[in-house]
Protein backbone atom coordinates (compact mmCIF):
# COMPACT_ATOMS: atom_id res chain seq x y z
CA UNK A 1 0.00 0.00 0.00
CA UNK A 2 1.48 3.32 -1.06
CA UNK A 3 1.37 6.01 1.58
CA UNK A 4 -0.51 9.22 0.70
CA UNK A 5 1.80 12.21 0.28
CA UNK A 6 1.45 15.76 1.53
CA UNK A 7 3.14 19.14 1.29
CA UNK A 8 2.82 22.27 3.38
CA UNK A 9 2.92 25.90 2.28
CA UNK A 10 3.56 28.32 5.15
CA UNK A 11 2.67 31.85 4.13
CA UNK A 12 3.73 35.10 5.81
CA UNK A 13 6.37 37.82 5.77
CA UNK A 14 6.50 37.71 9.58
CA UNK A 15 7.85 34.15 9.53
CA UNK A 16 10.67 34.89 7.12
CA UNK A 17 11.65 38.08 8.93
CA UNK A 18 12.05 36.19 12.19
CA UNK A 19 9.32 38.12 13.99
CA UNK A 20 7.15 35.02 14.37
CA UNK A 21 8.13 31.44 15.13
CA UNK A 22 6.31 28.74 13.16
CA UNK A 23 4.84 25.87 15.17
CA UNK A 24 2.40 24.57 12.59
CA UNK A 25 4.73 22.50 10.43
CA UNK A 26 5.94 20.44 13.39
CA UNK A 27 2.38 19.85 14.56
CA UNK A 28 1.18 18.89 11.07
CA UNK A 29 4.08 16.49 10.52
CA UNK A 30 3.38 14.72 13.80
CA UNK A 31 -0.36 14.40 13.15
CA UNK A 32 0.07 13.17 9.58
CA UNK A 33 2.70 10.62 10.58
CA UNK A 34 0.25 9.08 13.03
CA UNK A 35 -2.30 8.44 10.27
CA UNK A 36 0.15 7.24 7.63
CA UNK A 37 0.43 10.35 5.45
CA UNK A 38 3.96 11.35 4.52
CA UNK A 39 4.67 15.06 4.81
CA UNK A 40 7.29 15.15 2.08
CA UNK A 41 7.91 18.84 1.52
CA UNK A 42 7.37 22.16 3.30
CA UNK A 43 7.95 25.65 1.94
CA UNK A 44 7.98 29.05 3.60
CA UNK A 45 7.09 31.95 1.32
CA UNK A 46 6.38 35.68 1.61
CA UNK A 47 3.04 37.41 1.09
CA UNK A 48 3.77 37.48 -2.63
CA UNK A 49 0.69 36.73 -4.78
CA UNK A 50 2.60 35.33 -7.75
CA UNK A 51 4.67 33.05 -5.52
CA UNK A 52 1.64 31.84 -3.60
CA UNK A 53 -0.33 31.05 -6.76
CA UNK A 54 2.53 29.23 -8.48
CA UNK A 55 3.34 27.18 -5.39
CA UNK A 56 -0.29 26.16 -4.89
CA UNK A 57 -0.58 25.04 -8.51
CA UNK A 58 2.68 23.09 -8.39
CA UNK A 59 2.30 21.44 -5.00
CA UNK A 60 -1.37 20.53 -5.40
CA UNK A 61 -0.46 18.64 -8.58
CA UNK A 62 2.55 16.84 -7.11
CA UNK A 63 1.06 15.71 -3.80
CA UNK A 64 -2.11 14.01 -2.63
CA UNK A 65 -2.69 16.81 -0.13
CA UNK A 66 -1.49 20.38 0.27
CA UNK A 67 -1.91 22.20 3.57
CA UNK A 68 -1.49 25.97 3.78
CA UNK A 69 -1.23 28.12 6.89
CA UNK A 70 -1.55 31.88 7.15
CA UNK A 71 -3.06 34.73 5.19
CA UNK A 72 -6.81 34.27 5.76
CA UNK A 73 -7.35 37.00 8.35
CA UNK A 74 -8.97 40.47 8.05
CA UNK A 75 -5.99 42.66 7.10
CA UNK A 76 -4.55 43.94 3.83
CA UNK A 77 -1.78 41.33 3.75
CA UNK A 78 -4.19 38.40 4.13
CA UNK A 79 -4.17 37.46 0.46
CA UNK A 80 -4.22 33.68 0.53
CA UNK A 81 -7.87 33.31 -0.48
CA UNK A 82 -7.46 35.43 -3.61
CA UNK A 83 -4.39 33.40 -4.53
CA UNK A 84 -6.14 30.07 -3.98
CA UNK A 85 -9.08 31.23 -6.10
CA UNK A 86 -6.73 32.27 -8.89
CA UNK A 87 -4.82 28.99 -8.74
CA UNK A 88 -8.04 27.01 -9.24
CA UNK A 89 -9.65 29.55 -11.57
CA UNK A 90 -12.53 30.11 -9.16
CA UNK A 91 -14.29 33.22 -7.95
CA UNK A 92 -13.78 34.29 -4.33
CA UNK A 93 -16.57 36.24 -2.69
CA UNK A 94 -18.34 36.67 0.63
CA UNK A 95 -20.21 33.43 1.16
CA UNK A 96 -23.49 33.46 3.05
CA UNK A 97 -22.62 30.33 5.05
CA UNK A 98 -19.31 31.79 6.21
CA UNK A 99 -20.87 35.20 6.88
CA UNK A 100 -23.57 33.62 9.05
CA UNK A 101 -20.92 31.92 11.20
CA UNK A 102 -19.09 35.21 11.70
CA UNK A 103 -22.28 37.18 12.36
CA UNK A 104 -23.38 34.80 15.11
CA UNK A 105 -19.93 34.79 16.67
CA UNK A 106 -19.51 38.58 16.81
CA UNK A 107 -23.14 39.18 17.83
CA UNK A 108 -22.51 36.88 20.78
CA UNK A 109 -19.58 39.03 21.82
CA UNK A 110 -21.38 42.32 21.09
CA UNK A 111 -18.69 43.23 18.56
CA UNK A 112 -19.41 44.85 15.20
CA UNK A 113 -18.93 42.67 12.15
CA UNK A 114 -17.23 45.44 10.19
CA UNK A 115 -15.89 45.36 6.65
CA UNK A 116 -12.48 44.11 7.75
CA UNK A 117 -13.98 41.17 9.61
CA UNK A 118 -16.34 40.44 6.72
CA UNK A 119 -13.27 39.76 4.60
CA UNK A 120 -12.85 36.52 6.52
CA UNK A 121 -16.10 35.29 4.93
CA UNK A 122 -14.55 35.50 1.46
CA UNK A 123 -14.30 31.90 0.28
CA UNK A 124 -13.68 30.45 -3.20
CA UNK A 125 -16.78 28.97 -4.82
CA UNK A 126 -17.07 25.17 -4.45
CA UNK A 127 -14.83 25.15 -1.35
CA UNK A 128 -15.98 23.26 1.75
CA UNK A 129 -15.70 25.17 5.02
CA UNK A 130 -13.42 24.04 7.85
CA UNK A 131 -14.83 24.68 11.31
CA UNK A 132 -12.97 27.09 13.58
CA UNK A 133 -14.18 26.57 17.16
CA UNK A 134 -11.80 29.19 18.56
CA UNK A 135 -12.42 32.39 16.60
CA UNK A 136 -15.16 31.34 14.14
CA UNK A 137 -13.52 32.53 10.90
CA UNK A 138 -13.49 29.35 8.81
CA UNK A 139 -10.78 27.75 6.79
CA UNK A 140 -11.73 25.69 3.76
CA UNK A 141 -10.89 22.76 1.54
CA UNK A 142 -10.82 23.12 -2.23
CA UNK A 143 -9.98 20.01 -4.21
CA UNK A 144 -6.92 18.58 -2.39
CA UNK A 145 -5.87 21.83 -0.71
CA UNK A 146 -6.65 22.55 2.95
CA UNK A 147 -6.44 26.29 3.67
CA UNK A 148 -6.05 27.07 7.35
CA UNK A 149 -5.16 29.86 9.75
CA UNK A 150 -1.62 30.71 10.78
CA UNK A 151 -2.32 31.12 14.51
CA UNK A 152 -1.15 27.80 16.00
CA UNK A 153 -4.15 27.15 18.28
CA UNK A 154 -6.56 27.82 15.44
CA UNK A 155 -4.50 25.80 12.95
CA UNK A 156 -4.52 22.85 15.33
CA UNK A 157 -8.26 23.05 15.94
CA UNK A 158 -8.94 23.21 12.20
CA UNK A 159 -6.67 20.26 11.52
CA UNK A 160 -8.62 18.15 14.01
CA UNK A 161 -11.74 18.61 11.90
CA UNK A 162 -9.89 17.90 8.65
CA UNK A 163 -8.01 14.72 9.61
CA UNK A 164 -11.05 12.40 9.84
CA UNK A 165 -11.85 13.21 6.20
CA UNK A 166 -8.40 12.37 4.82
CA UNK A 167 -7.48 9.14 3.08
CA UNK A 168 -5.10 7.47 5.48
CA UNK A 169 -2.17 5.12 5.01
CA UNK A 170 -0.46 2.71 7.37
CA UNK A 171 0.83 4.43 10.53
CA UNK A 172 4.54 5.16 10.33
CA UNK A 173 6.46 3.44 13.12
CA UNK A 174 9.77 4.63 14.55
CA UNK A 175 12.45 3.11 16.74
CA UNK A 176 15.86 4.31 17.86
CA UNK A 177 19.07 2.39 18.51
CA UNK A 178 21.95 3.99 20.41
CA UNK A 179 25.40 3.02 19.11
CA UNK A 180 28.50 4.08 21.04
CA UNK A 181 30.53 4.67 17.91
CA UNK A 182 30.98 7.72 15.74
CA UNK A 183 29.15 8.15 12.45
CA UNK A 184 32.39 7.71 10.56
CA UNK A 185 32.93 4.30 12.17
CA UNK A 186 29.58 2.88 11.11
CA UNK A 187 28.82 4.78 7.90
CA UNK A 188 29.82 2.04 5.45
CA UNK A 189 27.97 -0.70 7.33
CA UNK A 190 24.92 1.52 7.64
CA UNK A 191 25.01 2.21 3.92
CA UNK A 192 24.78 -1.52 3.22
CA UNK A 193 21.82 -1.84 5.59
CA UNK A 194 20.03 0.96 3.79
CA UNK A 195 20.39 -1.01 0.56
CA UNK A 196 19.24 -4.26 2.19
CA UNK A 197 16.22 -2.74 3.92
CA UNK A 198 15.19 -0.42 1.11
CA UNK A 199 11.57 -0.27 2.31
CA UNK A 200 12.68 1.48 5.49
CA UNK A 201 14.11 4.91 6.22
CA UNK A 202 17.29 5.25 8.28
CA UNK A 203 18.48 8.39 10.02
CA UNK A 204 21.88 8.87 11.65
CA UNK A 205 22.24 11.43 14.45
CA UNK A 206 25.44 11.95 16.48
CA UNK A 207 25.17 12.57 20.22
CA UNK A 208 27.40 13.49 23.13
CA UNK A 209 26.43 12.63 26.71
CA UNK A 210 28.72 13.36 29.66
CA UNK A 211 31.79 13.08 27.49
CA UNK A 212 30.62 9.91 25.76
CA UNK A 213 30.06 10.13 22.01
CA UNK A 214 28.00 7.96 19.74
CA UNK A 215 25.28 7.79 17.13
CA UNK A 216 21.53 7.36 17.36
CA UNK A 217 20.18 5.35 14.45
CA UNK A 218 16.48 5.99 13.85
CA UNK A 219 14.55 3.49 11.75
CA UNK A 220 11.16 4.46 10.30
CA UNK A 221 8.68 2.38 8.35
CA UNK A 222 5.30 0.67 8.29
CA UNK A 223 6.38 -2.99 8.56
CA UNK A 224 7.04 -3.81 12.22
CA UNK A 225 8.63 -7.21 11.53
CA UNK A 226 11.01 -5.77 8.95
CA UNK A 227 11.93 -2.97 11.32
CA UNK A 228 12.78 -5.47 14.06
CA UNK A 229 15.06 -7.34 11.63
CA UNK A 230 16.78 -4.08 10.77
CA UNK A 231 17.08 -3.21 14.46
CA UNK A 232 18.95 -6.47 15.11
CA UNK A 233 21.37 -5.65 12.29
CA UNK A 234 21.96 -2.15 13.63
CA UNK A 235 22.61 -3.45 17.14
CA UNK A 236 25.29 -5.74 15.73
CA UNK A 237 27.31 -2.62 14.94
CA UNK A 238 28.05 -2.18 18.63
In which residue ranges do the predicted regions lie?
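Short beta-strand segments
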Residues: 9-10, 68-71, 130, 148-150
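An accessory alpha-helical subdomain
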Residues: 144-237
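Glycine- and acidic-residue-enriched helix-capping/strand-helix junction motifs
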Residues: 15-25
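Glycine-rich beta-strand-to-loop/alpha-helix junction loops that act as flexible
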Residues: 11-13, 68-76, 220-222
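Proline/glycine-rich low-complexity loops and linkers
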Residues: 51-54, 79-169
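Short beta->alpha linker loops
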Residues: 44-47, 97, 118, 181
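Extreme N-terminal starter segment of soluble prokaryotic enzymes
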Residues: 2-7
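N-terminal small/polar loop signature for handling phosphorylated ligands or for N-terminal nucleophile
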Residues: 26-78, 86
Amino acid sequence: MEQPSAAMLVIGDELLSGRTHDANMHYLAKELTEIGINLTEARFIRDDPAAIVSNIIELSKRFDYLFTSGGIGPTHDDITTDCVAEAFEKKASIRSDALKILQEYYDGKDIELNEARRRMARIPETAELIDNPISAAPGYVIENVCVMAGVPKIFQSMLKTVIPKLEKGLPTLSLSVKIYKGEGDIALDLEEMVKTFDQLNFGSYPFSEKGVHGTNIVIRGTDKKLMEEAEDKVRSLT
